[in-house]
Amino acid sequence: MFAEQFANVRAKSPLVHNITNYVTVNDCANMVLACGASPIMADDAAEVEDITTICSGLNINIGTLNSRTIESMLKAGKKANALGHPVVLDPVGAGASALRTETAYRLLDEVRFTVIRGNISEVKTLASGAGTTKGVDADVADRVTEENLDGAVAFAKAFAAKTGAVVAITGAIDIVADGAKAYCIRNGHPMMSAITGTGCQLSALTAAFLTANPGQPLEAAAAAVCAMGLAGEIAHARLTPLDGNATYRNYIIDAIYNMTPAQLEEGAKYEVR
């Protein structure tokens, strides 16, 4: 089923506007290129509306938040809404500071998001203020496991229904849900957590998939999550004893670049709830 979503990205090569963080911006741009789309990484408030206008989708990531980019995110998000473009929110570290949490709430209040993608602690913070974010990582107390999966799926569906956005909660088990349906995805490898920015790259990848698949936000987001996880598996299989997390990062991008829609279809590991 996900082969079609990936094939559309390669066929349409959509232009995606990313207002992302300075730690991972280069990797995010390369991830968008690897999947077959084109990135623009513009974050000055004086031009974001113009850039959003010439693009077909927007990815907002609050990882290295500052007062200058908050204005840029709000302006770009509102312009994307006016144009009917899909918008992704990656609320990196929501709950870790008042600025991050308040900005995430303001973005949710003023911008209509197509997909909200974060770890379980970040998404819990957005939903209720109850997440226990550990920096930009999910706290152990929040993490999704087989034992609490039913509750996590119900939570994701409820938050999706409340916001009108597809909710993508990523971790050892990924959940991608709208108000009625959820994909529980088991692709990926534990070593992905040793790389800074795999979540940021996934949000950029999700924006590309959304932009190429209008009207299918749930399936597009689930396809992107499966693709990223499968890339982590493929990349890990290439590692030698002398390779570390830097090599692994490059191999993940290579795996997306070389992945075919048929490989994604065959390698996606998910169930529907």
What is the role of each PLM region?
Residues R186-T196:
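Short pre-catalytic strand/loop immediately N-terminal to key active-site residues, enriched for Gly-Thr
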Residues T69-G118:
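Glycine/small-residue-rich loop that forms an oxyanion/phosphate-binding "nest" at active or ligand-binding sites
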Residues M31, C35-L89:
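Active-site cofactor/substrate anionic-group-binding motifs, chiefly glycine-
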